[in-house]
Amino acid sequence: MRIRLTFYFLLFAFLFNLNSGYTQNTKSDIFDLGKMWTFEHAPVDYFEKTYGFKATQEWLEDVKLSAIRFGNGCSASFISEDGLVMTNHHCGRGYVSSVTRQGEDLAKNGFYAENLSDERPVPTLWVDQLQKTIDVTKDILSAMDAGTTNEEKAKLKSEKIKEIETKYTTETGLKCNVITFYNGGMYMLYCYKRFNDVRLVFSPENLVAGFGGDPDNFTYPRYDFDCAFFRVYDNGQPLKSKNFFNWSKNGATEGEPLFVIGNPGRTERLKTIAQLEFARDYTVPATLMPLNFLANFLG
């Protein structure tokens, strides 16, 4: 099960007027491009009107700090006040391999730490907690305006991004990155607190975690154990945090609003017509060519 919906990089709708030589009137809905939003643009009025749920600023801040970025591209969550982290097994599988000792087969037999001393440090793993967001669109676009050519504008943009990232990283002590939204329509500065001491707590056997294979990967409900548990340490002790998701024994009920928070790798919902035409005419055919050759060879 892949977490695909998120508040970090979630999108809200834009209306596109496509000029193809004649006037074309189309009705558009605010959610034509999906119900995906960033935290800073969550439609709280819509939540309350449609679901009767009041998403206060305190609630948004709490869930933002409870969700974390796991390694280079997965989602995870704090699920206890002692730094316990839950993520998907396929996100942690490679890290499990890195702490497997001689004579062990953790992929086949799984792993469980009965106490804190049994938890295994993963030297190549970190988690990031989003703590600060700043809209820096005006700063970057203003810097680009000084350029007279596309090359100059691109160079000025890169220089300004580096300047902003360096400034806020130095001032806050956080890891700050400028994130591009809407193909350059908006630039946000995301500042993360990074935790480098992360230890393996539990990982099921690969056969149990991946039961059903890829065909079941896009079904719901899915009957497998695609989860893994780690723990974040701070100064050699389990991290103490007031921001975490409480475990629910009952699960969701019918009609209950459900929010999924995480870190998607990318989205293609806002591609332009030119980009889609290029994909249709070049990218997709180039991808299909070797696949068709292989299919004909095997068949």
Which functions belong to the PLM regions below?
Residues 21-299:
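Terminal presequence/propeptide segments associated with secretion/organelle targeting
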Residues 1-27:
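Bacterial Sec-dependent N-terminal signal peptides
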